Amino acid sequence: MATKIRLKRQGKKFYAFYRVVVVDSRKKRDGKVIEEIGTYNPNTQPSTIQIKSDRAQYWLGVGAQPSEPVFKLLNITGDWQKYKGLEGAEGTLKTVEAGPDAEARIAAVENQAQKLKAAKAEAAAKAKAEAEAAAAAEEAPAEEAAEEAPAED
């Protein structure tokens, strides 16, 4: 059986991602596959390439021919160099640098929440103090008016 390692298209219009599959060369592009050996998502930065190296080595060893796009992916991951016994078997796959630690992000969010709570409490205390001052100011003129008025006997 003539086998090929090629891409099977998934996803929706204008947002395709692919599965790297081993398939009989006479089957349709998205037809029945023998084995799925990886995925490729060109929509992420950098592109996500995940290929099961041992399975790719096996299928290359038994004569499966990679398509041109899969050949390029195998070169990037270093699987083709391993199969051929060439230098550079570690591949040139780029990885996303790890962002800030999750715990650090959680701590930052909690710190910001504490600041917001403190600001709200301070604003509420200030509003309460102003309300009390206004109430005291209203009572003071009422008392002065009572003192100034002549007492009725």
From Swiss-Prot:
UniProt keyword annotation of Ribonucleoprotein present: yes
Gene3D superfamilies listed in its UniProt record: 3.30.1320.10
Basic and acidic residues bias (residue ranges): 121-131
Region (Disordered): 121-153
Record GO terms (molecular function): structural constituent of ribosome
InterPro entries per UniProt: Ribosomal_bS16 (IPR000307), Ribosomal_bS16_CS (IPR020592), Ribosomal_bS16_dom_sf (IPR023803)
One Pfam assignment: Ribosomal_S16
Domain of life assignment: Bacteria
Stored PROSITE patterns: RIBOSOMAL_S16
Keyword 4Fe-4S (UniProt): no
Record's compositionally biased regions (Acidic residues): 140-153
Alphabetical UniProt keywords: Ribonucleoprotein, Ribosomal protein
A single Gene Ontology CC term: cytoplasm
GO biological process, one term: translation
UniProt similarity note: Belongs to the bacterial ribosomal protein bS16 family.
Protein name stated in the entry: Small ribosomal subunit protein bS16
Species whose genome carries this gene: Bifidobacterium longum (strain DJO10A)
